[in-house]
């Protein structure tokens, strides 16, 4: 039999260690991971914009970094329904960023062809792929908590 402790201010029992139904730590951990991965993606794009990627693409990379920062803050700061909205938007943002890179690597995007040997492309592929998976889990957890499942 697992020991339980009272969830902080929730009035519901929480499993020790936060795993299991009713635990409050698990969604917070996933929200934190989501925020870190959003910041990593934004950081990669900002680095590229400041170190050689110029023109319209450089401006889009700066906007990507700003969007990632805003979404990372929203993921950790919001609760209830606004958190669900932020989580879904973050997932769409991450999927869109990954899709744009994959398109640039394959058929080209807006006349830009990318190669795997370009600066940080393999890193971006890994971070964006992991970020997509983490955000799917985060969004599912937030949705389940919202429904009370």
Where are these regions (language model features)?
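Membrane-interface extramembranous regions
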Residues: 2-149
């Amino acid at each position: 039999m697992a020991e339980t402790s009272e969830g902080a201010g929730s009035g519901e029992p929480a499993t020790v260690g936060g795993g299991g139904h009713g635990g409050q730590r698990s969604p917070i951990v996933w929200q934190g991971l989501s925020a870190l991965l959003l910041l990593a993606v934004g950081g990669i794009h900002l680095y590229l914009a400041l170190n050689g990627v110029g023109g319209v693409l450089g401006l889009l990379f700066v906007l990507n970094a700003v969007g990632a920062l805003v979404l990372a803050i929203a993921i950790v700061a919001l609760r209830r329904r606004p958190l669900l909205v932020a989580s879904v938007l973050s997932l769409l943002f991450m999927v869109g960023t990954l899709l744009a890179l994959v398109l640039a690597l394959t058929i080209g995007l807006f006349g830009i062809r990318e190669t795997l040997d370009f600066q940080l492309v393999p890193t971006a592929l890994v971070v964006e792929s992991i970020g997509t998976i983490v955000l799917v889990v985060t969004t599912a957890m937030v949705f389940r908590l919202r429904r009370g499942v």
